[in-house]
Amino acid sequence: MKKVIYALILPLLVVSGLLFASSEIKKETSKKSTPKPLSAAERNAELKRWEATPDGINYKKWEASPAGKKVYAAEATIRKHINDYTNMEGVITSLLLPPGSRLGFGVMVRINGDDYIVKFEPEKSQLEQLHSLKVNDKIIIRSHTVSHAPKYSYPIVWGDYVERDSKVIFKRVPRKGGC
């Protein structure tokens, strides 16, 4: 009888010990996972340290190069539309992104005489409409974001809203759970 009681109590102790240990581990990781925001001085110091790395040096060279200046100038021409989230008229120049790009699905568009990469993050249901785009289609784009990278010779516009012939063909779906 004692052996049966011990056989029942021993697994109960082992399981309760494991549960207690896992709850302690969860508490420790939750305390560590919330870093405090950096102050302006700390942020500037981190930026200076990064600028001294090989990647930072290459980035600064790119910014000062004619290619970097061209990208910044193209960004400046659409900055008001980006900030105000207003319509930008463009013409699709290519359905393919530059060779070696890792941006996912996108197209090349000419807006006000400058070329841009328009990047999309479509749901599977939205891909069919985006695949219906053709070269020389006139589209209207709205975006909240424009970015750049030394790897690309064009600014990268995140396509939040696209319409063709007064019909919406893409509207970015907000992510679940916030941002």
Q: Model-predicted segments: where are they?
A:
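Positively charged n-region of N-terminal signal peptides that target proteins for export
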Residues: 1-4
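OB-fold and OB-like beta-barrel modules that bind single-stranded nucleic acids
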Residues: 87-92, 136-144
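Short nucleic-acid-contacting surface segments enriched for D/E, G, S/T with interspersed K/R
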Residues: 124-142
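N-terminal post-signal-peptidase region of extra-cytosolic proteins
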Residues: 76, 91-95, 118-129
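OB-fold/S1-family single-stranded nucleic acid-binding modules
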Residues: 146-178
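OB/S1-fold single-stranded nucleic-acid-binding modules
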Residues: 6, 17-84, 177-179
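Structural detector for short beta-strands of small beta-barrel domains
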Residues: 83-103
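OB-fold (S1/OB) nucleic-acid-binding surfaces
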Residues: 100-120
